[in-house]
Amino acid sequence: MRIDQTIGRLKPGVSTEQAQAEMQAIAARLAQAYPDTNAEITATVVPLRDFWYGKVRRSFWLLLGACGFVLLIACANVANLLMTQATVRERELAVRAALGASQGRLIRQSLSEALLLVSIGCAGGILLGVLGVRVLVSLLPEEILPFFVKIELDGRALIFTLLIAIVTAFIVGLIPALRTASVDLDQSLKEGGKSGIGSRMQRVRGLLIVTEIALAVVLLAGAGLMLRSFTRLQNTSPGFDADNVLHLEINPTYRRQEDYRVEFMSRHYQQLLQQIATVPGVEAVAANSDLPFVGQRPWYRGEFSVEGQSSEEQKLNPVVNYQAVSPDYFRVMQIPLLRGRAFTERDTVGAGAHRDVAIISRQLAERIWPNAEPLGKRVNCNNDGSGCAEIVGIAGDVKHNSLVDEAGYDFYCSAFQSYSKQTHFVARTKGDPMAVAKEIQRAIWQVSPDTGIFNVMPVTRLSANTIWQSRIWGLLFGIFSGIALVLATAGIYGVMAYFVTQRTREIGVRIALGAQWRDILTLVLTSGMFYVAVGLAIGLAGALALTRLMTSLLFEVSPTDPATFGAVAFGVILATLLACYIPARRAAKVDPLVALRYE
């Protein structure tokens, strides 16, 4: 099965569905006209945007949601700070109101202060954003980005940021502004009257803290799952050893029709391999028509048949990945040969050569011959029984598309018995593969001066490029969740510090009446950890529901992984306990004589 891709532009007014229907009709007519070659050929129309971004669209939405969570936590934090400031300045605001300041003027003042704070934060955020985008782009593999994609902060992003800043200023300034507008003049202007911390405002502060903790827990759970998934991916074997292996892709030039004969191509590749093998530092070299992780899918997939099978039995066989490899391929890539033998120099064409031979993967062997020995079986015969390939070896399974995907059914034929172009060369080296890259290129040009060479890189990079999404998403989720935890911890610290400040006199009275430092410590910690417990419970419940949206991003990790959720709960409790302990310890050390005179 050959997979061909074509890019086209639809006429104005033509939908994707209409194009799909027309392509299917064309495929059906071709199948009817040419049943031997087009009987099972189909056509699928996919918008280019979906082709490039379809698999990562959900990831981008999740990242946008994470940004929104961090923004909400920051809003709650700033709102709490402004509420505290408004409470402390309650008498000042009451004096202004008594001197004729209208409620609208007081509200505008509160919103202006919020806008000033948010503007400063927005300016700093844009600067950090510019630096952050540069760092992010530097972490992305060059090969995975389409040529037309540029990641940068353009005018649209800046306008969006400014709009978000204005909305944020309104959100964080609204609650303090309403508090300012509802100042009780009589109570606030009384001699010695304290700025109140009424039960309503205390509940609002508590609600904001609970919200911060809950959102932080959701982000931490997502980051923890991504981290565990990435760790599993890094420890996953692709079926070969990529360390110290260099990859080169070549584009040989054939000028004559005779150049495409198997005999010439076989001799040409043998000369290239022999010349590369002479380069100092090269232990072994091989060629392959389709190296794992280079393309989106195996270059050639097709039907597989066994000698003696009926046509109905052949329909049950899996589609296999066909690859033409040189004799040392399994040695270079260190793909284990489970049974049988590897290819040799005699597995070629011409006098004295072996007849066509093949090596299949363990998974294919177990699928076709679950209770029999595949070695010696003849496969892919012509209708007259000729042209069969004899299975001479069973190799280990190899992942082709990415570390996330399962291994496929692999069928290896000898490169020296195949018409396929072996455009991928791999060389196992004694040290850093890139250290000998230039010498290997010169060796190729000595044999074939007009051969194009590109995609020169270590095979480890090819492997790493398949998990770039997990690496980047995990990094970004980790950064967002870290910021969220710091903000939530700072928020509860601020609230508890204010709690201690407002109740200093009460604490002094308790100490004067015989309360021990442990009692004061318990009082403050209990008040703070109550909010933590409620926020943690809500956050864990929300995480259990929302992390299911990340299922497609995870590898061998459940979206409700108990270990991850347990670690998140422990981390949040530890961080917030420390945030509560600092003001609690200060409260326990209050001098009762000073506290009783505290205003």
Residue ranges and their predicted role:
Residues 74-118, 490-530, 536, 590:
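Interfacial "coupling" helices/loops that link adjacent transmembrane helices in transporter permeases
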Residues 65-75, 167-171, 217, 248, ...:
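Hydrophobic transmembrane alpha-helices
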Residues 4, 17-70, 87-90, 132-163, ...:
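Membrane-helix entry/capping segments
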